[in-house]
Amino acid sequence: MYMESVDESGNVKEKISYKSQMLHYGLYDPGEGYFPEIPWHWHEEFEFGYLTGGAIRYKTAREEFILREGDGIFINSGVLHALHPEGNPESIRLHSQFFGREFLAGALGNIFDIRYLAPVAEQKALEAVPVYGSIPENMEFLEGLRRGIALSREGGPFFEMRLRSLFSQLWETVYGWAREKGEAGARRGAEDERIKAMLAWIGEHYGEKMTVEEIARAAHVSRRECHRLFRKELGTTPAEYAASFRLQR
């Protein structure tokens, strides 16, 4: 599998391309080498990450975690997040498993999707969950992540069915996390869509002079609300984000 950014989201939405469109699952296994800083982005797929070396700071709009060797993480569908190496970037070994709702449900809109996958994807209060290896209760879940990586690498007959069965078991835990988040998701969901609209506009016009008022209009909010959202969601100002985006290009 490989990943690429697409223009529709101002170089912020990431498109996951699978080896086969018949299996909406992919393991991103970069191997040894320098691990770069990964700027703000999002993708429709769910993500399970697992570290076998080094340390990474994960940031979402509202949370921040430092993961070390033996830790894992779940990133929900559509969540803005960024990754920053902690310490030596060459020591980092991150293994990310991406999968769409179709992988577990079989097809969008069927009973499995409606009952178990969509409620998690639509729970905007659930951005990411770190799974620390230092907590004994997490051992079974982390072993599931390791087993998923091994199955994907090995391939062979029936690996797709074994992988889907394994992820179905892990999903019971993920579904429980979503239920615990309560009713805060609707308000957060609206803010997420506004910040994505403004990031998309910056991505489309980064080569031009721009004002905060123009950025705010992309999400139909005031200048003040624009500043508030950037501070709350990304920890920066609209101007600072635009300047950083230009440098990355």
PLM features per residue range, with description:
Residues 70, 225-230, 234:
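Short hydrophobic/aromatic patch on the recognition helix
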Residues 78-103, 109-112:
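Ligand-binding loop in jelly-roll beta-barrel domains
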Residues 111-142:
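Aromatic/histidine-rich interaction motifs
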